[in-house]
From Swiss-Prot:
InterPro entries: BTB/POZ_dom, SKP1/BTB/POZ_sf, Znf_C2H2_sf, Znf_C2H2_type, ZnFinger_BTB_dom_contain. May be involved in transcriptional regulation. A zinc finger (C2H2-type) spans 472-494, 500-523. It is found in: Nucleus. GO terms for cellular component: nucleus. SUPFAM superfamilies: beta-beta-alpha zinc fingers, POZ domain. The keyword Mitochondrion does not apply. Its main location: nucleus. This is Zinc finger and BTB domain-containing protein 3. It comes from Homo sapiens (Human).
Length: 574
């Protein structure tokens, strides 16, 4: 015995032996193991650690699935509409807080049947969720929408399934948005534009001007039908014209046109509708600069087929010419046809290719705005080069009353209602103080669309003016707006008017806010630091309503209202 005590380091005293035993039991050295029924013998017990069996959970779920398929030990029936599902209450309560709360609130004798609202949770969706509870995998089938699974999971408070379904729906929405964007981009690239012109006698050859640009969006338009068929040389394939939809300044070479036709000028304009129109060469004098002339063989055109209509008052300015309004269309249908004018000699007949650069209307200031033309008429020389021999229009800052847009009604026109001009070449009010060339051929109804509201849409004096329609709609592009004032501001996009001009550098802008920012940035005007609106800001910028315009009449009668038509002139000290 003493040998055993000395072996374990314990004295023969029983009291000290018990103290040693207690110290060993308090520590993690080992366990007490009695020998021969005594409490004095100790031996350390080795620790084996935790042994894991990863297959246990899978085997448990597989066993539960087999029990559910056989109906073994199933103690609950879930009713979804008329469909019954056998399950185990323990599994349902473990996977869904909905069932856990349901079984806690119900008595033991009322837990056998659970009825779920079938208008929120569908039977196929609940079947998928029940399979997930027993398998740990969610399998989405084509006959069950993801939205139904999301609704069922939300009803049963299965948050993991809700997150997965939401991510799937968001990914699908992004994919649909991308496909829709690609489809819109594809639809925006229309076929190339083709315009047919005809003469008033004999067979009518086709005029087809083509541009070799393959990557631009193109659309196909045809003019008014001619009574005679189109004639084309048998050895030459038909030629189509491409629309110039690039930014202004992009030049494209046009091939020669071999089909016989009367002398016309092919004018490519970067219009708001991104189309190419063909207008007669008689619109321009022979002294036009910056155009490429391509002589063609002389054509036999009788002078009796052409005529010129001169304005009634050659000396006075032509008030705004806007044809009467007609049914709104999505885009104007430009038509090309020979317009009557003085017939040139057959030896002088030639084709003129004219590239007119349009203004890019933007709220941002550009550094090259001084070099760009301020309108379609800036591309031609003054002194009667366009629309007759009237003198050019004076600049806006020299005479505030000589420029700007005026709103006119259907009865305020001076020429017949069938002018055959491309839509965006129709002279706006006060734009061209020159003679207008008209055509004996009828023009389509889309050419009579006014850019601004006509008189029948104007409201009483003192108001902004409202539409007789339910929603204010642009007659040119079909866009709708919340109020008529916003529509009037939008109209400058189509007219390409820049009525606000800087009195320092003479740059023009579409909106008054753009001019204000330009002066504050470029000319160090400390206008932005004023805490309150300054009534002198308007006179400082030289913004005055056009005398005699409906805007001036409304402001004079009502004493207020946002401005609509302006002519920007420098401030004068009186």
């Amino acid at each position: 015995m003493l040998r055993e005590f000395s072996k374990w380091g314990v004295e023969a005293s029983p009291g000290k032996a018990w103290e040693r035993k207690r110290s060993l039991l308090r520590g993690a050295v080992g366990r007490y193991r009695g020998a021969t029924g005594g409490d004095l013998f100790w031996a350390p017990f080795p620790s084996w650690g935790t042994m894991e069996f990863p297959e246990h959970s899978q085997q448990l779920l597989q066993s539960l699935r087999e029990q559910r398929s056989q109906g073994f030990l199933c103690d609950c029936t879930v009713m979804v509409g008329s469909t019954q599902f056998l399950a185990h209450r323990a599994v349902l309560a473990s996977c869904s807080p909905f069932f856990q709360l349901f079984y806690k609130e119900r008595e033991l004798d009322k837990r056998d049947l659970v009825c779920i609202h079938n208008e929120i949770v569908t039977a196929p969706a609940f079947g998928l969720l029940l399979d997930f509870m027993y398998a740990g995998q969610l399998t989405l089938r084509g006959d069950t929408p993801v939205e139904d699974v999301l609704a069922a999971a939300s009803y049963l408070h299965m948050n993991d399934i809700v997150k997965v379904c939401k991510r799937r729906l968001q990914a699908r929405a992004l994919a649909e948005a991308d496909s829709t964007k690609k489809e819109e981009e594809t639809n925006s690239q229309l076929p190339s534009l083709e315009f047919l012109s005809s003469t008033s006698r004999g067979t009518q050859p086709s005029l087809a001007s083509a541009e070799t640009s393959g990557h631009w969006g193109k659309g196909e338009w045809k003019g008014s039908a001619a009574p005679s068929p189109t004639v084309r040389p048998p050895d030459e394939p038909p030629m189509s014209s491409g629309a110039d939809t690039t930014q202004p300044g992009m030049e494209v070479d046009a091939p020669h046109l071999r089909a016989p036709h009367p002398p016309v000028a092919d004018v490519s304009l970067a219009s708001p509708s991104s189309s190419t129109e063909t207008i007669p060469t008689n619109y321009f004098s022979s002294g036009i600069s910056a155009v490429s002339l391509e002589p063609l063989p002389s054509l036999d055109v009788g002078p009796e087929s052409l005529r010129v209509v001169e304005p009634k008052d050659p000396g006075g300015p032509l008030q705004g010419f806007y044809p009467p309004a007609s049914a709104p269309t999505s885009a104007p249908a430009p038509v090309s046809a020979p317009v009557p004018s003085q017939a040139p000699a057959p030896a002088e007949a030639e084709l003129v290719q004219v590239k007119v650069e349009a203004i890019v209307i933007s709220d941002e200031e550009t550094d090259v705005s001084d070099e760009q033309p301020q309108g379609p008429e800036r591309a031609f020389p003054s002194g009667g080069a366009v629309y007759g021999a009237q003198p050019s229009q004076p600049e806006a800052f020299e005479d505030p009353g000589a420029a700007g847009l005026e709103e006119v009604g259907p009865s305020d026109h001076f020429l017949p209602t069938d002018p055959h001009l491309p839509y965006h070449l129709l002279p706006g009010a006060g734009q061209y103080h020159r003679g207008l060339v008209t055509s004996p051929l009828p023009a389509p109804a889309s050419l009579h669309e006014p850019l601004y509201l006509s008189s029948e849409y104007e409201a009483a004096p003192g108001s902004f003016g409202v539409f007789t329609e339910d929603v204010p709609t642009c007659k040119t592009c079909g866009k709708t707006f919340s109020c008529s004032y916003t529509l009037r501001r939008h109209a400058t996009v189509h007219t390409r008017e820049r009525p606000y001009e800087c009195r320092y550098c003479l740059r023009s802008y579409t909106q008054s806010g753009d001019l204000y920012r330009h002066i504050r940035k470029a000319h160090n005007e400390d206008l932005a630091k004023r805490s309150k609106p300054d009534p002198e800001v308007g006179p400082l910028l030289g913004v005055q309503p056009l005398p005699g315009s409906p805007t001036a009449d409304r402001q004079s009668s009502s004493g207020g209202g946002p401005p609509k038509d302006f002519v920007l002139a420098p401030k004068t000290n009186i």
